[in-house]
Amino acid sequence: MAVTIKDVSAKCGLSISTVSKAFNNYADISLETRELVQRTAREIGYYPNAIARTLKTNRSYNLGVLFQEKRGTGLTHSFFASVLDAFKSAGEKRGYDITFINHHIGWTGMTYLEHCRYRNVDGVCVVCADFYAPEVIELVDSNLPVVTIDHSFNNRSCVLSDNIGGLKLLVDAAYQKGHRKIAYVHGEKSSVTENRIIGFYRAMQEHGLNVNPDFVVEALYDNPATSMQAVLNLMNRPDPPTCILLPDDHSTLGAMQAAKQLNLRVPEDLSLAGYDGIRLTQMLQPRLTTIEQDTKRIGAQAAEFLIDRIENPRTAGSETATIPVKLLEGESMGICPVKTDAANS
């Protein structure tokens, strides 16, 4: 015989109404009661009917995720994989599943907003996309609850990693090791890039250092080949930098290859630093100096913002959370090998 909500009610010693409210996350049901009901349901093998719950609450308990990564790494990129895993876990704790939003259902093309409506999602988290694309703006401007990661819209909640602070930590670390000729190889145009460039210039200014415009160059994120070429160009200048900050940890692989081609030792002759704090790069020799982003907190906070907006539309306003980052001091950034002019120190 199939297990029913009545069985859960009897096992918990609660009314059917209370058990139903617990399953549907009503605000007047305590967390302790919800956990008791959910734990009991698992123990006796009861699972609420999703269709019935949708009819009762007018919600699908389904969160859309827009993830359009064009560099080819997709969910193999540890930053995005970790953020999405935390988002998924936080959503599941509050009774929500996730659905990826795209352009197609089979052979049928549609906009992101149309796909959201087709899938009947309660809200959407934009994790990675061209935030300036008309289709993304259409989605953000719709009446659907939306939260964004690492990009801010005036009328939407967002979760930002402290990209300005991250570059400041790297410049501070380089300065403390005697570096004055510091170059920054940044990624392609995005809100993340813009904030990191601001952080670089701001930190250099705080240390009284002039920024050589030729020392701020563009490469592609997660593309070691373009960073390798950027480093070769920088180091072939008459007065090259002594320390180079890269767009991300993967890009430092290209930078290290460039140093090898030029017969430069890292960090004795050239210091390098990455960004993201990918665990695998901590196995490099020398161990990489980098910035670790709190991906778990980013994903969890995005889920909380979105679900609060879904469940409390009249009281949950647009919020912004800036998540702190952490400097991982490795061995790829060393003491500056040459003396610098006092005027530039």
Give the predicted meaning of each segment.
Residues 43-49, 105-109, 128-129, 256:
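Short gly/ser/thr-rich secondary-structure transition/capping motifs
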Residues 33, 76-79, 135, 193-196, ...:
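Residues at alpha-helix caps and immediate loop-helix transition turns in enzyme cores, especially N-
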Residues 58, 62-172, 176, 234-236, ...:
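Alpha-helical recognition/docking segments in bacterial nutrient-uptake
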Residues 1-61, 340:
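N-terminal helix-turn-helix DNA-binding module of bacterial transcription factors
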Residues 25, 29, 51, 75, ...:
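Conserved acidic
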Residues 2, 48-49, 109-110, 132-133, ...:
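Structural motif corresponding to alpha-helix initiation and N-cap regions
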Residues 43, 86-94, 141-147, 152-345:
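Bacterial carbohydrate/catabolite-sensing allosteric modules
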